[in-house]
A protein has these predicted regions:
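GST-like domain detector, emphasizing the conserved glutathione-binding G-site
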Residues: 1-135
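Amphipathic alpha-helical packing segments from all-alpha helical-bundle domains
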Residues: 137-152
Length: 152
């Protein structure tokens, strides 16, 4: 039986979505973040050395990282879901397949870092802080976005 090790507020939500769309039977094991540190609990290290989520176990196979999990699920269970999901990826060896892989990994690797930075620098000025610091924080965050994040 496939098990999804789901950590609250993690990227495993998209794995849940795909499992449902593919109609794959699965068990859901839910983990809570530490209330103080917001880190994953140590129990996840017993599943995978990274100690993070999402992670799936499928029999003897353990797969970590959401992009790798999505690829594994499509390759292994893609035929089980809705008819229109049967061909989620183009045929292996084709240019379309290479492009699909590129965009999947670009989204997970290169793009995600910039998206997280943008989110952080957009959020900082909205957080509680002394009134005299707020304009400085806003200017610094805007400059970081303009000169570093947005050009990339």
């Amino acid at each position: 039986m496939l098990t999804l090790h789901h950590l609250e507020t993690s990227r495993s939500q998209r794995i849940l979505w795909l499992l449902e769309e593919l109609k794959v039977p699965y068990e859901l094991k839910i983990y809570q973040r530490d209330a103080k540190t917001r880190l994953a609990p140590p129990e996840l290290k017993a599943i995978h050395p990274l100690g993070k989520s999402p992670v799936i176990t499928d029999g003897e196979i353990t797969v970590a990282e959401s992009g790798a999990i999505l690829e594994y699920l499509v390759e292994t269970y893609g035929h089980l879901g809705k008819k229109e999901l049967a061909n989620l990826t183009p045929a292996a060896g084709t240019e379309a397949h290479r492009q699909c892989r590129f965009w999947m990994h670009y989204a997970e690797g290169s793009l995600m870092n910039w998206m997280v930075m943008k989110l952080v620098f957009m959020t900082i000025p909205t957080q509680p802080m002394p009134f005299f610091v707020k304009p400085i924080a806003r200017i610094i965050c805007q400059q970081v976005q303009n000169k570093l994040v947005d050009p990339n």
